Design a protein with these regions (language model features):
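Auxiliary Fe-S-binding modules of radical SAM enzymes
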Residues: 1-20, 210, 218-308
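Acidic (Asp/Glu)-rich catalytic clusters
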Residues: 72-74, 102-109, 129-139, 171-175, ...
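Core AdoMet radical
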Residues: 48-68, 72-95, 110-123, 138-166, ...
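Short amphipathic alpha-helices and their capping/turn segments at secondary-structure boundaries
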Residues: 68-72, 123-137, 168, 197-207, ...
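Conserved C-terminal portion of the radical SAM core fold
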Residues: 164-223, 239-264
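N-terminal [4Fe-4S]-dependent radical SAM core
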Residues: 1-82
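Structural recognition of alpha->loop->beta junctions
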Residues: 42, 104-111, 198-212, 282-297
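Hydrophobic faces of well-ordered beta-strands that scaffold small-molecule active sites
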Residues: 20-24, 81-83, 114-116, 140-144, ...
């Protein structure tokens, strides 16, 4: 039994085979890092701007892409790829620069589309106009991070934008029929389980194309590392997180693609929680919890319509 709709199955439906994302660092930054909004960046984010450790930042986008494709092709015998502009904010630059970057991403013959990670406050109409060109030209997936809909938390973690800006950006992008995803983090400082579920209940009715959920991880060198080591930042327990994810999946529309349910990383970059180094085991526990309940993704989505 399939308990939720996976990103792999979604891409297979579109392209007829397994498609792999190649993470890229375009050398950009974020408006909450460079002082446009605030300085310092998100308090959970490391110096790579949430980019994958496999990214070779010293290389050009073309070389990053070629190196990444060669690595993934060798490991998985893959044939099709998405250029994934992952690190930092990939719509935070003049349109001419962004166009050059996206064009390089699409220039490889085995690249079948783009994934672009960004923020809600970096999607003005000019940027959306540019993205519309690529939406018409290729497979375009726009990932708009929000993490939580609670403004007090967004301020506490130094996001530099509000929940209202997120909802506005989603509305404007959906009018252009973009494929949209967002990211949620469970376990942010000061948030209760009720807060996390309130975020899920606010996001679910948007009927985004896809959703990422993961636990708060403490990365080395981040402001959150200092808080955690000082005992000021409790983290979710493993079983608690499993239960919360199962609760969330039940509320999410069954057609929404689930891109991620557990964050993972290496001990070189993450200090806690310990269980984040066992992604496969946690995924199995989430499925086992849904099996125990006799539920799956979307089982309780109708509740949201009734309460609305």
């Amino acid at each position: 039994m399939s308990y939720y709709r996976t990103f792999n199955s979604y891409l297979r439906e579109i392209f007829g085979e397994r498609v792999y994302r190649v993470p890229l660092d375009a050398g950009l930054t974020c408006p909450n890092r460079d002082g446009t909004k605030v300085f310092g960046g998100c308090t959970f984010c490391d110096e790579r701007g949430s980019g994958a450790p496999t990214i070779k930042t010293a290389l050009s986008i073309k070389n990053q892409l070629e190196t990444g494709i060669a690595r993934i092709r060798h490991r998985f015998k893959a044939h099709k790829f998405l250029a994934y502009f992952q690190a930092f904010t990939n719509t935070y630059a003049p349109e001419g620069i962004l166009k050059e970057l996206y064009d390089v991403g699409l220039d490889h013959p085995d690249v079948v589309g783009l994934c672009i990670g960004t923020r809600p406050d970096c999607l003005d109409e000019n940027i959306l106009d540019l993205l519309s060109v690529y939406h018409e030209r290729t497979f375009l997936f726009l990932e708009v991070g929000v993490q939580t809909i609670h403004n007090r938390t967004l301020e506490a973690i130094n996001r530099g934008h509000t929940a209202e800006e997120f909802f506005d950006a989603v509305e404007r992008a959906q009018k252009r029929n973009f494929r949209l995803a967002t990211h949620l983090i469970f376990g942010l400082p000061g948030e209760s389980e009720a807060d996390m579920m309130e975020t899920v209940r606010a996001i679910a009715p948007l009927k985004l194309e896809a959703l990422k959920i993961h636990q708060l991880c403490i990365y080395k060198g981040t402001p959150m590392e200092a808080d955690y080591l000082a005992g000021r930042l409790p983290l979710l327990e493993e079983d608690q997180y499993v239960r919360l994810v199962a609760d969330a999946l039940e509320l999410i529309p069954e057609e929404t693609v689930i891109m991620r349910l557990v964050a993972e990383g290496s001990r070189d970059e993450i200090i806690a929680p310990e269980w984040c180094f066992e992604k496969d085991r946690i995924m199995q526990k989430i499925e086992a919890e849904l099996e125990r309940r006799g539920t799956k993704q979307g089982s309780r989505y109708a509740e949201l319509a009734v309460k609305a």
